[in-house]
Amino acid sequence: MKLFINEFIKDYKKKTTWLYFLLSFGIILLNSYFAKRQFEDGIDAVKILSGITVVSAALALVFSLIMLANNLSQEYSKGTIKFLYTKPKSRSAILTAKIVLAFINYIIFLVVGTVFDFLTKYYVFFDRKVGLNHLNDTIEEGYFGRTVAKQLIITNLADLAVFIFFVAMVVLVCVVFKTQILSLVLVMLSLLGTGLIQSLTIFAVSKFSWAKYHMFDVPLFSSYYASEAGRNTVKEFFKFDNANALIIMLVAYSVVFFTISYIVNARRDITID
């Protein structure tokens, strides 16, 4: 616990952490502005509220992974791990603390961002017309007949599951190669290069059914639960008839990545640069 608290304090003493919060607020405000323009003819409070966490979740994922990659790369270059030549258990404890901190950072960014998004939409952009009284309203169509509250719970749990996979991937790359750049490139490729990767996957799946099981298709898990349109796309183009294969992929890749990371982290000969 002391180790985790120490890592937490170190993170929130950094100016870059607070810069990430400011960037998040700026992006959220910009998104709210465009949302207001979109609903000039009439406010759909249910639709707006049901997607209130979308931007915050995406930003939380990106910034918490950047912080994790930076923390791990610094640990191997000038941190405590560098000097723990004969204490693999201590190395594993430090690695675990940083992984746990990544999840805490994700939740903090998600909650703070969502609260900020809601308050600015409620008081600034939509003149108190997007309120919590709509949480029990049913979304009209395309969302499995869910209420707003149920939609928020399901989508955020699915996003959190996918976040576990991304954390495992970042940790693996940082531990094995001791660099944050490659890990961030992989994450950004997964997030920003989705269109290209999915186009190639759709083509490959039409030729070889096993091609759909590559790691960059794991994020489809959140798409499967996000909406009816998303589920239909996953089924029709990527040939996942249900979520079982996606769950197995998510768990399998995450377990393998974490296992390799801990083994390498415990056995690596760490040299002083």
Residue ranges and their predicted role:
Residues 74, 87, 122, 175, ...:
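Transmembrane helix-loop junction
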Residues 27-71, 96-175, 220-247:
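Secretory targeting signals
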Residues 20, 228-273:
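Alpha-helical transmembrane segments of multi-pass membrane transporters/translocases
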Residues 4, 71-108, 270:
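Helix-loop-helix units of permease transmembrane domains in multi-pass membrane transporters
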Residues 29-37, 177-218:
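Transmembrane helix segments
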Residues 21-24, 98-99, 187-188, 250:
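Residue-level recognition of transmembrane alpha-helices
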Residues 1-21:
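Aromatic- and glycine-rich beta-strand/loop motifs that create alpha-glucan
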Residues 15-17, 90-91, 179-183:
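Membrane-helix interface segments
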